């Protein structure tokens, strides 16, 4: 895992109990309830720590998720749309987060803008099924990916801030 701040943030996310995916209609409702409670707690903790960095919502079934994530670099906010589907084998298989507008801009991304979490995150997820959920995906997957990739993409000139795009 990462630094002390990440460890602390993750330790404050409630662990999930229900081992169910979208195929199991009745238990899936219970799993979704746990997912939402963990996400709400994680977002509340982030806001308290002045580290608010994403918004996430789902379709009615809880199988398609979308929202925005952002990264502050040199006091400029870089904001991106994100999306992912819950795999039918969830929670055994972690979702693959896509940031479509960054597609093709980094080697740490698959076709369609799906971020690469294979080396570091997926083994951690596999060891923690079914306790890890979407809040853990954000904290241990997307958050660290943004922290590494966005400054690199900015330094290479592959992404620019909205205010700098017009000039």
UniProtKB/Swiss-Prot annotation:
Coiled coil: none annotated. GO terms for molecular function: UFM1 conjugating enzyme activity. GO terms for biological process: protein K69-linked ufmylation; protein ufmylation; response to endoplasmic reticulum stress; reticulophagy. The keyword Lipoprotein does not apply. SUPFAM superfamilies: UBC-like. InterPro entries: UBQ-conjugating_enzyme/RWD, Ufc1. Keywords: Ubl conjugation pathway. Pfam families: UFC1 (PF08694). The keyword Thylakoid does not apply. The active site is at 116 (glycyl thioester intermediate). Interacts with UBA5 (via C-terminus). Interacts with UFL1. Interacts with UFM1. PANTHER family: UBIQUITIN-FOLD MODIFIER-CONJUGATING ENZYME 1. E2-like enzyme which specifically catalyzes the second step in ufmylation. Accepts the ubiquitin-like modifier UFM1 from the E1 enzyme UBA5 and forms an intermediate with UFM1 via a thioester linkage. Ufmylation is involved in various processes, such as ribosome recycling, response to DNA damage, interferon response or reticulophagy (also called ER-phagy). Belongs to the ubiquitin-conjugating enzyme family. UFC1 subfamily. This is Ubiquitin-fold modifier-conjugating enzyme 1.
């Amino acid at each position: 895992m990462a630094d002390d701040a990440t460890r602390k943030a993750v330790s404050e996310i409630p662990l999930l109990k229900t081992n169910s995916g979208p195929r199991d209609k009745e238990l899936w409702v219970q799993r979704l309830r746990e997912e939402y409670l963990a996400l709400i707690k994680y977002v509340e903790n982030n806001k308290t720590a002045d580290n608010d960095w994403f918004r996430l919502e789902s379709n009615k079934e809880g199988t398609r998720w979308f929202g925005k994530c952002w990264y502050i670099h040199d006091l400029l906010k870089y904001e991106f749309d994100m999306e992912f589907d819950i795999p039918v084998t969830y929670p055994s298989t972690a979702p693959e987060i896509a940031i479509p507008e960054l597609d093709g801009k980094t080697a740490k991304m698959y076709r369609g803008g799906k971020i690469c979490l294979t080396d570091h995150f997926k083994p951690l997820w596999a060891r923690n099924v079914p306790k890890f959920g979407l809040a853990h995906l954000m904290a241990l997957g997307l958050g660290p990916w943004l922290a590494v990739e966005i400054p690199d993409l900015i330094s290479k000139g592959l992404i620019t801030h909205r205010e700098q795009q017009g000039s």
